[in-house]
C-alpha cells in the first residue's frame, strides 16, 4: 500500500467516483488510477467499490470505512510535514480558509491584512461557500480552517472555537410600511411580508426559521442568496424585507435603506472557527486565531489545538466574554 494509492482513492471519491475527473484533477491518467485502485484492493483483500462494467457506482460498506481511514492517514502525513516545516521554515507555508461571503467580505479583510504584514511569505487561500460547501471542503481535507455561523452539526470532526456573537438586522426601503412603523416590528409583522435572506437561514434547523416556528408562524421567504450585497440589491428592488448580518451593513447603505436591529426577535448567533481535531497547528495558524478571536488567550488556543473533543473546547470557552459584532449598526433602534 502506498500514499499514492490512498491519494488516488480519495481523489476518485471526492470526484463523485468519476475516474476521468479524478485523473484530470490529479494530473495523471485514467488507466493509471484504475490500475492503482485494483492493486490496492488485491493487496488488502477487500472490494472497495461496487462496479457496473468499467464504471464505479458506489463504495462498499468496507470501502466506506477504508476511505475514512485513508483520510486520517493523509491528514497524519500532512501533520508530519507541517511539523517539519514548523521546525525548518516557521515563516513560510499556506493558510487555507473556507468561509461564508459575509465573513470573507466584511470581517476578514482587516484581519488578513494584519496577518499578511506579520507573515508575508505565507500564501493565503480563501474559499467561499455555504455551510454545506464548507463542510465538504473540510471533509476533503482541502482547508486548514472553517469559519461559519450556526450549522455546528455539519462539523462533528472539528474543534469549534466560538469567536463572536451577532444579532440579525432587518432592512427595508425607506418608504416601506415597516420603516414608517418600525417601533412595532414583531415576528408576526415580518411574517406578513416577503423576506429576502441568506441561504443557510432557509435550513429548517436554523435559528431564523425556529424563531418563527416557536410563534407558530410561517415566514414567506421568497429569495435566498449567499451574498449580502445581492440581498441588499433585491431589497432595494422591492422584492422583500431583508434579514442580514450586521457586519454586512455599510454606513452608505443607510442613505437609501432603513435598518432595524432584530435583537430579541431572533436568537443571538455565534460565529465560530474550526479545524480538524487531529490537525497540528503551525505557529502562524495559531496567530491567525489570535487575530480573528483576540479574546482567546494564547494558552487557551494551545489547549484547544490539542483538545480531543468539542466538549473540552466548550469547557475552555465557558469563561470567555465573547465580543458582539455590530458593523454600522451602532445606535440603531432595537425591535420591540
Language-model features: locations:
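Beta-alpha-beta core module
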Residues: 155-162, 166, 229-278
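A short LG(V/I)-centered, amphipathic sequence patch enriched
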Residues: 41-61
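Short helix-boundary/capping micro-motifs
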Residues: 12-29
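Hydrophobic/proline-rich hinge and linker segments of small-molecule sensing/allosteric domains
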Residues: 159-200, 268-278, 293-297
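Secondary-structure junction motif
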Residues: 179-180, 185, 194-215, 281-290, ...
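Central regulatory/effector-binding core of bacterial HTH transcription factors
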Residues: 92-154, 224-225
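C-terminal effector-binding regulatory domain of bacterial HTH transcription factors
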Residues: 246-254, 264-336
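Short beta-strand-centered segments that line the small-molecule binding cleft or hinge
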Residues: 87, 110-114, 132-168, 172, ...
Amino acid at each position: 500500500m502506498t500514499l499514492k494509492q490512498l491519494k488516488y482513492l480519495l481523489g476518485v471519491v471526492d470526484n463523485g467516483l468519476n475516474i476521468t475527473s479524478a485523473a484530470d484533477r490529479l494530473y495523471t491518467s485514467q488507466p493509471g488510477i484504475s490500475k492503482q485502485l485494483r492493486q490496492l484492493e488485491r493487496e488488502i483483500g477487500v472490494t472497495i467499490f461496487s462496479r457496473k462494467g468499467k464504471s464505479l457506482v458506489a463504495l462498499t460498506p468496507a470501502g466506506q470505512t477504508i476511505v475514512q481511514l485513508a483520510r486520517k492517514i493523509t491528514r497524519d502525513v500532512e501533520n508530519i510535514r507541517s511539523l517539519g516545516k514548523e521546525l525548518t521554515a516557521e515563516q513560510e507555508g499556506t493558510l487555507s480558509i473556507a468561509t461564508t461571503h459575509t465573513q470573507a467580505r466584511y470581517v476578514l479583510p482587516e484581519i488578513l491584512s494584519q496577518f499578511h504584514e506579520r507573515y508575508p511569505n505565507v500564501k493565503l487561500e480563501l474559499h467561499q461557500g455555504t455551510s454545506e460547501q464548507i463542510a465538504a471542503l473540510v471533509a476533503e481535507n482541502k482547508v486548514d480552517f472553517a469559519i461559519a455561523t450556526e450549522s455546528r452539526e455539519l462539523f462533528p470532526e472539528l474543534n469549534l472555537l466560538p469567536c463572536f456573537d451577532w444579532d440579525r438586522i432587518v432592512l427595508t426601503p425607506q418608504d416601506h410600511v415597516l420603516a414608517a412603523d418600525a417601533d412595532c416590528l414583531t415576528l408576526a409583522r415580518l411574517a406578513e411580508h416577503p423576506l429576502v435572506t441568506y441561504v443557510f437561514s432557509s435550513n429548517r434547523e436554523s435559528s431564523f426559521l425556529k424563531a418563527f416556528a416557536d410563534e407558530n408562524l410561517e415566514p414567506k421567504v421568497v429569495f435566498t442568496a449567499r451574498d449580502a450585497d445581492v440581498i441588499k440589491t433585491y431589497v432595494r428592488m422591492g422584492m422583500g424585507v431583508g434579514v442580514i448580518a450586521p457586519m454586512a451593513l455599510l454606513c452608505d447603505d443607510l442613505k437609501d435603506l432603513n435598518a432595524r436591529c432584530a435583537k430579541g426577535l431572533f436568537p443571538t448567533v455565534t460565529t465560530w472557527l474550526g479545524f480538524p481535531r487531529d490537525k497540528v497547528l503551525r505557529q502562524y495558524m495559531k496567530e491567525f486565531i489570535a487575530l480573528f478571536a483576540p479574546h482567546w488567550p494564547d494558552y487557551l488556543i494551545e489547549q484547544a489545538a490539542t483538545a480531543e473533543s468539542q466538549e473540552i473546547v466548550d469547557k475552555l470557552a465557558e469563561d470567555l466574554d465573547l465580543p458582539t459584532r455590530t458593523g454600522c449598526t451602532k445606535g440603531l433602534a432595537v425591535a420591540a
